[in-house]
């Protein structure tokens, strides 16, 4: 009986996330729930952008190539595609805007920071969404991005912050009241 009671109490907090066909749809749905928990400034020298090696996530079927991105403070992005080295450039314009491309003025796009913490990084391409082919750049810390696919990584991001929204103070107050009542009627 005690197990059933605990299962019923825990059930509302064990929410299964819906399946999405594309990474873009999933990010559109999950981003509003986690946006407030991330860092907000790309200009900070201690920002995760510069401290973490990022793996680019994709929802292309059959894609197995690991693309590891390292953002250097000098404006260079060193990219390893399964060990083969490549490079790009970036320039931080404001706290939440960055240009990323082959060079700052060639094959480059303006992105806006949507979410950044020590494990996940999401940029959204600036402009009219109807004209944009790839709306988001989604990166994960190397330890996450090399072992999970895009939908599992997004679930991990949501789970990380879902627990932070849980009203622990409320639970502690209720628990204290229950213990107090039990001691009183003992």
Regions inferred by a protein language model and the residue ranges of each:
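Lipid interaction determinants
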Residues: 1-72, 78-80, 84-85, 100-186
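Short, conserved beta-turn/loop elements at beta-strand boundaries and strand-helix junctions
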Residues: 94-98
